[in-house]
Regions:
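Conserved catalytic cysteine-centered active-site region
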Residues: 5, 13-16, 49-83, 114-167, ...
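Short, well-ordered beta-to-alpha junction loops that form the rim of enzyme active sites
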Residues: 110-112, 182-184, 380
């Protein structure tokens, strides 16, 4: 949630009536649907593999978490992010019982890189590519008749920023139903940037481990159908959205600010009308980078205080890689599945937690089984764009 708006339903200190999630969809390196992704994560399966999309000889790092859908090894094609986005939205809409005509439904998309990979292939290699294909709205209009399409490029918290806007639209009466999605794919430029800033090239993502070396990117898309709570009669409810809080602390271009992250946690709890001790599960941002994991752990320690060891915690980027703008919404879908099933995926590769997180209840080894009601989902990005959501289990 952003700063207070003028209408009472969106006042920053007023808990919102929960909106309901009535459909979910996802595709990434560990699965082709939301249910398949969750099953893979609970089994501890990782999408990590040798880099396939471009020439490994140009980089120190040699691995990534890619969707293996290219026509031939070592080659790449345009439009992959758009195809995954459409696929995730199709699944979520089908799950919600919506038809193919989404002309009346706002679609809000969070992305860090959009179709930058297609632009790279077009500009450098001469691949056939029309500039209109950079915009997801073109494909969504053609496939679903969508005309109210919004794109948010807020780095790694983009899809939760989109969720905040979608929540505000519902609260303000601008729509009864919205679709919120997130998507990103590996690009050579971003992979190269990360390859240069790491002191040592990481071979896997190991969030909160003392020996972590950095982040590796992953492909993926996620989507949910969100409906106002008072208009959800007859819907099969996946879970409740209690709050989304966003801020931009502007602390540094890339380094996180503990105070800014902590403010986002406090804001999400306040808007949800809950206390830190009420949270049963934390879906960590957990990128496996030196600064980010430390800052996230310190912020949680400050906000949760004596209760920091209570909730189960996990970081699924250890299996999916960092899916950038889509990662926050993927975390939310996993959180909803965990609340519903009582299963929490493990953090793969976490052997010895960093000192700042020594008292946390990390899920390690195998998935955990627990009775869960409330989950917190974290997403933080470059420039201090922080977003935190709180979701609740739907009572059957």
């Amino acid at each position: 949630m952003t700063e207070p708006l003028t209408t009472d339903p969106l006042a920053a200190d007023t808990p919102l009536l929960p909106h309901v999630v009535v459909g979910v969809g996802a595709v990434n390196s560990v699965g082709g649907s939301a249910d398949e992704v969750f099953a893979s994560l609970c089994a501890g399966r990782t999408g990590r593999a040798e880099l396939r999309g471009f020439d490994r000889d140009r980089f120190r790092a040699q691995h990534a978490y890619e969707i293996d859908d290219r026509p031939e090894p070592g080659g790449d094609v345009t439009g992959r992010a758009t195809r995954w986005l459409v696929r995730a939205i199709e699944e979520a809409a089908r799950d919600a019982g919506l038809g193919d005509d989404l002309g009346e439904v706002p679609i809000l998309i969070g992305t860090g890189l959009r179709e930058l990979r297609s632009a790279e292939l077009g500009w450098r290699d001469g691949a056939a590519f029309d500039v209109s294909e950079l915009h997801f709205g073109t494909a969504l209009r053609e496939r679903f008749g969508a005309v109210r399409t919004y794109t948010f490029s807020n780095a790694c918290s983009a899809s939760l920023y989109a969720l905040a806007m979608g929540s505000d639209l519902l609260a303000a009466g601008g729509a009864d139903t919205v679709i919120v999605a997130g998507v990103d794919t590996l690009t050579e430029s971003m992979y190269g940037l990360l390859d240069r800033v790491h002191m040592q090239p990481p071979d896997q993502v190991r969030p909160f481990d003392k020996d972590r070396k950095g982040v590796l990117m992953g492909d993926g898309a996620a989507a949910i159908v969100l409906r106002r709570g008072d208009g959800a009669a007859g819907s099969a409810v996946r879970g409740l959205l209690r709050s989304v809080y966003v801020n931009c602390d502007g602390y540094h271009v890339t380094a996180p600010d503990v105070a800014g992250v902590a403010e986002a946690l406090v804001g999400a709890h306040r808007l949800a009308g809950v206390k830190s001790e009420d949270i049963d599960l934390v879906m960590l941002h957990g990128t496996g980078t030196l600064l980010n994991d430390e800052a996230e752990a310190l912020a949680i320690g400050q906000v949760f205080g004596a209760h920091a060891g209570n909730p189960l915690m996990t970081a699924v980027k250890s299996m999916t890689g960092h899916t950038s703008g889509g990662s926050g919404l993927l975390g939310l879908i996993v959180a909803l599945s965990s609340l519903e099933s009582g299963r929490v995926p493990p953090t793969v590769g976490l052997r010895e937690p960093v000192e700042e997180a020594a008292g946390f209840r990390f899920v390690r080894g195998e998935h955990a089984a627990a009775e869960l009601r409330l989950a917190q989902v974290n997403a933080f990005g470059f420039g201090g764009v922080n977003a935190v959501a709180v979701v609740e289990r739907a009572e059957k």
